């Protein structure tokens, strides 16, 4: 199984390490031609507006939209979640979205860098809570009918969503040694018949 990790900006190295710890090949994706032959793609955290501009400059927005529409499993964390959302609050007018999930997200909803926190949360069908690191994280304010909520904070704030082949979370699972959220994504990839 080959999992691409978008590597134009942000925390891509940690995601690659998680995939490799789980026994699969991780490929850094910086150009559109590197999207070919992938079984899945991770879009990491970073700065969402910067990432969207780099994707535009690199000619990757349309190829990504097409691959997602064709069913490529994609997992976005933090800024990656923002890029996947249909609607983004508190963003710049020149930011781009892939419009891959029927959700509304608010950028930096949990405050500034000093407001970062760690907690344990339920996630999908994982049997015990996962480690979740929140750094200037977005939150999901609205979900469409076809979106499954897979993780919430104790107060009900939505921080994990899935819509078909697209998975997203507000937090950074790659910053812990707990690889179970990545395993969850790999199970999505395997559901497409990929080993």
UniProtKB/Swiss-Prot annotation:
Pathway: Cofactor biosynthesis; pyridoxal 5'-phosphate biosynthesis. SUPFAM superfamilies: Class I glutamine amidotransferase-like. GO terms for biological process: glutamine catabolic process; pyridoxal phosphate biosynthetic process; pyridoxine metabolic process. GO terms for molecular function: glutaminase activity; pyridoxal 5'-phosphate synthase (glutamine hydrolysing) activity. Keywords: Glutamine amidotransferase, Hydrolase, Lyase, Pyridoxal phosphate. Gene3D superfamilies: 3.40.50.880. Its EC number is 4.3.3.6, 3.5.1.2. The keyword Lyase applies. One of its GO terms (cellular component) is glutaminase complex. L-glutamine binds at residues 46-48, 107, 135-136. It catalyses: aldehydo-D-ribose 5-phosphate + D-glyceraldehyde 3-phosphate + L-glutamine = pyridoxal 5'-phosphate + L-glutamate + phosphate + 3 H2O + H(+); L-glutamine + H2O = L-glutamate + NH4(+). The keyword Hydrolase applies. The active site is at residues 78, 172, 174. In the presence of PdxS, forms a dodecamer of heterodimers. Only shows activity in the heterodimer. Belongs to the glutaminase PdxT/SNO family. NCBIfam families: PLP_synth_Pdx2. Catalyzes the hydrolysis of glutamine to glutamate and ammonia as part of the biosynthesis of pyridoxal 5'-phosphate. The resulting ammonia molecule is channeled to the active site of PdxS. HAMAP family: PdxT. This is Pyridoxal 5'-phosphate synthase subunit PdxT.
């Amino acid at each position: 199984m080959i999992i691409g990790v978008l590597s134009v900006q942000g925390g891509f190295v940690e995601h690659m390490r998680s995939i490799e710890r789980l026994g699969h090949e991780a490929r850094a994706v910086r150009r559109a031609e590197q999207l070919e032959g992938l079984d899945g793609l991770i879009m990491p955290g970073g700065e969402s507006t910067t990432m969207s501009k780099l994707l535009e400059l690199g000619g990757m927005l349309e190829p990504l939209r097409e691959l997602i529409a064709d069913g490529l499993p994609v997992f976005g964390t933090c800024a990656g979640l923002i890029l996947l959302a249909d609607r983004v609050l508190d963003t710049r007018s020149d930011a781009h979205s892939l419009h891959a999930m029927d959700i509304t997200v608010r950028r930096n909803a949990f405050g500034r860098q000093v407001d970062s926190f760690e907690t344990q949360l339920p996630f999908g069908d994982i049997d015990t809570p996962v480690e979740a690191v929140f750094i200037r994280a977005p939150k999901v304010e609205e979900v469409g009918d076809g979106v499954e909520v897979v993780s919430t904070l104790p107060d009900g704030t939505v921080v994990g969503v899935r819509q078909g082949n697209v998975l997203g979370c507000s937090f950074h699972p790659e910053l812990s040694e707990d690889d179970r959220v990545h395993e969850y994504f790999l199970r999505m990839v395997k559901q497409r018949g990929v080993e």
